Amino acid sequence: MTMTINTTETTPVIAIPTAAARAATVAGAALTVASTFLAWTYTDAFPGNLTVYGYPGGLQVLTLISAVLTLLFATAGYGVRGLGWINPAQSNNSTFLVALGTFATTWFTTIAIAVELGGLANLEPGGFVAMAVSLLTVIAALGLPLDRQTKASLPQFSWPTFIGLSIITGAVVYPLWRYIRLGSNPREIRRAKELPNWAEILIIAGAFGVALYVFTYGIDTEYAQLFIGYLISVAFGFAALTRAGLIARITRLTTKHRNVTLAAALVAAFCFPFTQQNEQYALIGANILIFATVALGLNVVVGLAGLLDLGYVAFLGVGAYAAALV
């Protein structure tokens, strides 16, 4: 007789009532959205012009998008019709991860303002409000039932390992990981209700459109602070979508409609140069396509002539030249 040892549990990190935790998470996310419409600094010396009321700019846009995602995931926990599609795994881990990403982006922005402009005095009240409500959202999300590793399943604690990994990860990440203990989802991902083919194709097209926009937004960032904030938001956002099971659901649709997926990928690649503000990436792409075509042609010609070894050399040589261009 074999014993099954559970390595995961669904428990909150902070012992507060689930209803109160979810309500606070929703409220915190909504307030974070509102805070992006306030000025975070009084001077436009910081890139992105975060001085305007009623119009988010620069890094505020990243906080806004992350906060909206947090609001959607937290609200989906109430069983709102239509929102269940975005969290088929029914896991609160996605809510916590995107809330953590919102917090990290917001605090990175405000700290960058203070460091670059010479102190917290350069922050407007809106900046302090954003810091407070994003922190509230993360704390509230820790009160939701999270899928966590059991204490028994963690690596055995040892002070040398703890100190070493804490130093490597910046003295914060590893201790927090051991404290929060986020684990995998023990439940099966719910299968979506069958949709008409045209609706599934629209979802695939929309997914490729969003992916193209996110990619082009990242490579077109105009300053380092925005790029770092972009990396933070995308990393936590993708992790949240993965834990929610949404990436798996989209993957299932693309597998079902392979031809449509291939067409969508080609259309996205064709549209990519038209999304650029300069010709740099378009020229690189054109050069790669030219040499890829030459390599394919050489391979076909020498292959028909029976000179297969020469074909391999030609293909690799042209590929190496194209890679050097990149």
Predicted feature locations:
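Single transmembrane alpha-helix segments in multi-pass membrane proteins
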Residues: 70-71, 278-326
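Hydrophobic core segments of alpha-helical transmembrane domains
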Residues: 67-78, 131-145
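Alpha-helical membrane-associated segments of multi-pass integral membrane proteins
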Residues: 121-140, 309
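Membrane-interfacial amphipathic/re-entrant helices at transmembrane-helix boundaries
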Residues: 11-24, 28-66, 107-130, 151-291
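Canonical alpha-helical transmembrane segments
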Residues: 66-84, 236-245, 303
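Short, intrinsically disordered terminal tails adjacent to the first/last structured region
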Residues: 1-11, 18, 25, 93-97
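Cytoplasmic-side transmembrane-helix entry/capping segments in multi-pass membrane proteins
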Residues: 89-99, 251-262, 284-290, 310-318
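Short, solvent-exposed interaction modules
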Residues: 91-114
